[in-house]
Amino acid sequence: MDSNSWINCPPVFSSSPSSRRYQSRSDLYLGDVEGEDDLKAEFMCPFCADEFDIVGLCCHIDVNHPVEAKNGVCPVCTKKVGLDIVGHITTQHGNVFKVQRRRRLRKGGYSSTYLTLKKELREANLQSLGGSSTFIPSSNIDSDPLLSSFMFKPPSAIPITEGDSVAQVSPKDTSKSKIQQESFSNEDQEKAKKSKFVRGLLWSTMLEDKF
């Protein structure tokens, strides 16, 4: 089975029913499709009338209409679905996903709408894990002083002026220096832990985008 199905939406890390739905949808087979030019490029959301391609529509319904999606009209076949519209689309209309993938490959990428929906799903996943719901892309790292301080600032050092020598340092000064060094050391350790967490989060996000 091809792992490059529509569910290039970020992986869901919880064991909730929605995560199991995503996993089952990731098993769609993508191959040659007959009459792909006859299929619509976009479909209207049955709940808010916005138009998306089939991939974007499924992401949109899962994010914005999870409750309504349990009962509604399929936008592809216009039949009334009594349970899980997105599950119905992915299982009964897999050929549409194949067509959309071919069209995306010909155009050379994904639409900004799809990328926005993908980001929303990632933020929802982080929220479900009790983490922050704000995702900061690598291009915005420089504009975020807190994140920048975690990732790029070297450990602080105690300045030493010319003329200072070991002989000139009294025991009292040495004691103060040790306290300062311990304080800096604790602060650096805390920054290192935060930096490691942020780097791991950014790396996992970049790997998701690649695969």
Swiss-Prot record:
Write down the Pfam families for this protein, in alphabetical order: Di19_C, zf-Di19
Chief location bin: nucleus
Which InterPro entries does the protein's record reference? DI19, Di19_C, Di19_Zn-bd
What are the entry keywords?
Answer: Nucleus, Phosphoprotein
Which positions carry Phosphothreonine? 113
Superkingdom classification of source: Eukaryota
UniProt key word Phosphoprotein: yes
Tell me where it resides. Nucleus
Q: What is this protein called?
A: Protein DEHYDRATION-INDUCED 19 homolog 7
